[in-house]
């Protein structure tokens, strides 16, 4: 019985590693966009031939419920007329300041939306499908849709493998030009991500910025004074059902001086903006000053570890961060009182004495890092990890 308890930590650690490898091996492949559209068409056929097709149902509730609002676009001439897009609830229009809403996207292949763009001068709507957040509940879209009659009818414009669209921008004077920031697949790497440009109203697209298979474009803005100048942000992230890597080298800010044909990276080691593995999602906005200068603002989810403040330290305490990177040799040098205090502070059972732990580490039965993860889970790691967090530049 005593021997079983002694090996408990080692067994749990080994099982965790084995399960992690097994999950990687069993990660299912993504469903291609063509198959998803084929399934949607099959659903329509089944619905048309259903014996209850002509029976009309009325929703009697509950009605006081909603979801994430991803975009609102308001008429520049009538503030009571606007469109509202939902993460997984479609597109809606109101002409009476929200007293009532009309659904516009219920009959399309998907209900998930990442961004919308409206040309109020000619009643044209663009919808980029697939919420751009990266939660487990952020469902994929099927590309870009366009309506030239205020949402009555829709034309599918492609980019089916983009899955999650963060931004659609329309050229202020050329009705045929639009840009799309595509984040790409959430659970798998893919190539259809980055910045896309159309010069024929959405009939064809050119990929003008591509970073790598796990980094897509999440945001983009036009220079208020020059539509040939654009700024975009890329975001590297990787989601699994059991894990989320929300930052990486592929997260950066880019600039185009030729209408989005080519791009140059403007964030980096010497730019003053964060760089490296800890850079997460980046949001952008631009403004024009009174003297004609353009100011670019960037909000970044900085996952780099927060540096210790002046005078801030853990004193003589043994910390989890120290244990995670500690060698067996250095662990053997830890004073007994430090190890005892750590074990007591982190809720180790009394039978795990400093002498016993040192013996197990020296024999290779456990590693120093095992002690750091003894009572951790996803929630504790989230709130105990001291990262820089949100920054605005």
Report residues per predicted region:
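Bacterial Sec-dependent N-terminal signal peptides
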Residues: 1-26
């Amino acid at each position: 019985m005593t021997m079983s308890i002694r090996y408990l930590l080692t067994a749990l650690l080994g099982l965790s590693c084995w399960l992690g490898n097994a999950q990687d091996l069993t990660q299912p492949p993504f469903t291609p966009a063509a198959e998803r559209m084929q399934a949607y068409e099959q659903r329509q056929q089944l619905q048309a031939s259903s014996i209850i097709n002509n029976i009309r149902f009325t929703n009697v509730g509950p009605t006081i419920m909603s979801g994430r609002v991803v975009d609102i676009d308001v008429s520049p001439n009538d503030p009571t007329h606007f469109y509202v897009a939902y993460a997984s609830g479609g597109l809606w229009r109101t002409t009476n300041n929200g007293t009532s809403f009309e659904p516009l996207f219920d009959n399309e292949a998907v209900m998930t939306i990442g961004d919308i763009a409206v040309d109020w001068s000619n009643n044209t709507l663009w919808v980029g499908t697939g919420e751009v957040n990266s939660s487990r509940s952020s469902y994929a879209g099927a590309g870009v849709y366009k309506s030239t009659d205020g949402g009555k009818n829709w034309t599918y414009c492609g980019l089916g493998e983009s899955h999650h669209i963060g931004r659609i921008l329309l050229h202020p004077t050329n009705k045929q030009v639009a840009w799309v920031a595509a984040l790409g697949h959430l659970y798998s790497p893919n190539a259809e991500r980055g910045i896309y440009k159309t010069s024929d109203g959405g009939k064809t697209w050119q990929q003008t910025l591509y970073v790598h298979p796990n980094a897509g474009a999440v945001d983009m803005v036009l220079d208020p004074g020059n539509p040939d100048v654009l700024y975009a942000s890329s975001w590297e992230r990787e989601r699994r059902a059991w894990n989320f890597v929300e930052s990486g080298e592929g997260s950066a800010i880019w600039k185009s001086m030729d209408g989005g044909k080519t791009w140059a990276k403007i964030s980096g080691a010497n730019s003053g903006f964060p760089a490296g593995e800890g850079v997460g999602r980046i949001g952008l906005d631009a403004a024009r000053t009174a003297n004609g200068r353009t100011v670019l603002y960037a909000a970044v989810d900085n996952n780099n570890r927060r540096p210790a403040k002046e005078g801030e330290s853990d004193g003589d305490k043994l910390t989890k961060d120290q244990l995670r990177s500690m060698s067996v040799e250095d662990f053997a040098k830890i004073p007994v009182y430090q190890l005892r205090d750590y074990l007591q502070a982190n809720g180790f059972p009394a039978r795990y004495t400093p002498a016993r732990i040192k013996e197990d580490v020296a024999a290779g039965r456990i590693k120093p890092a095992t002690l750091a993860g003894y009572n951790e889970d996803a929630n504790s790691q989230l709130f105990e990890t001291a990262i820089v967090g949100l920054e605005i530049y």
